[in-house]
A protein has these predicted regions:
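Catalytic domains of carbohydrate-active enzymes that cleave complex glycans
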Residues: 1-4, 12-43, 47-104, 176, ...
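Short, acidic/polar
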Residues: 8-15, 47, 102-112, 159-168
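Short amphipathic alpha-helical segments and helix-helix/interface helices
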Residues: 13-16, 82-86, 109-110, 133-138, ...
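Catalytic-core region of carbohydrate-active enzymes that cleave or remodel glycosidic bonds
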Residues: 113, 118-195
Length: 278
């Protein structure tokens, strides 16, 4: 018999316990990232054991399959990933698998579609695909599976205009979400990683000498984007179409102008949720 995974000493247990302690169960989807799957020379019995026990553990904690997803290959579409995804689905077809693919053609993506459950596309993927007629994005949209947009780094030198606008970019496309990969910055997550010379990879928060973390202006704007996204989603649930307004705001050129436009939009559209207002 295969050895049992000691979940009692795992980071996963700590995270699940913390979510329960905060009263946040049901409010989050767990993104279960591991690198040992991709690092293995080939698929093996230990991986079989891990994924079967992972599914059993999440079930024992009261979580449905739609409340967690596995990320085990990063920015690749290679044979090892395809084989790994097939094996995970062989073990348990309900385990969901996440992908943040590199720029790819529809033909490169097609073999993966039966095995992957959520796609998160970087701006570089979208730019290259736009040059090729948007065929890859059209293929992914045809699956009906969740589509997100993301950026990797968040640096102080990047235009502030990028941060609130990301929500509008996702909304305009009719997609399901948006995120930054590095919310805290690589050197804060992994002390062994040194950014290339000239790159200040701080994410969107800062850590002081006492271990206290502070948000940046970039974080504040990204957080406003989350509010924008939630408002538009609520309006759509009411059957209120704001596609034209979203397109107009996406064309706004700088952060200050976008902020002014969005605040006016919110002030007007929030009336839809006030009894007696129109």
């Amino acid at each position: 018999a295969k050895a049992a995974v000691n979940w009692e000493k795992s980071n996963l247990k700590q995270v699940l316990d913390r979510v329960d302690a905060n009263g946040d169960r049901g409010k989050v989807t767990f993104f279960l990232e591991n690198w040992f799957t991709g690092a293995a020379d080939r698929w093996n019995a230990d991986l079989d054991n891990y994924y079967l026990q992972l599914a059993a553990y999440m079930k024992s904690r009261g979580y449905r399959y739609d409340q967690w997803i596995v990320h085990c290959f990063d920015e690749v579409l290679n044979d090892k990933f395809l084989n790994g995804a097939k094996n995970i689905k062989r073990l348990d077809p309900q385990i969901r698998i996440f992908s943040d693919p590199p720029p790819a053609t529809a033909e490169q993506l097609r073999p993966f579609l039966p095995y992957l459950d959520c796609f998160c596309l970087g701006s570089w993927f979208l730019q290259e695909d736009a040059n090729n007629g948007n065929k890859a994005v059209e293929l992914l949209r045809s699956t009906g599976k969740p589509l997100w947009i993301y950026e990797c780094d968040s640096q102080p030198r990047h235009p502030l205009n990028n941060y609130r606008r990301m929500a509008l970019n996702s909304l305009q496309r009719g997609w399901d979400g948006f995120t930054f990969w590095s919310l805290t910055g690589l050197q804060f997550r992994h002390a062994s990683i040194t950014p290339p010379e000239g790159v200040v990879n701080y994410g969107m928060t800062y850590l002081d000498e006492n271990g206290v973390r502070y948000p940046s202006r970039r974080w504040a704007l990204w957080e406003l984007g989350i509010d924008d996204y939630a408002l538009v989603a609520a309006l759509r649930q009411k059957g209120i179409d704001v596609s034209g307004e979203i397109r107009t705001m996406c064309g706004t050129k700088d952060a200050a102008a976008l902020d002014e436009a969005m605040e006016a939009f919110k002030k007007e559209k929030l009336k839809a949720f006030i009894p007696g207002e129109k």
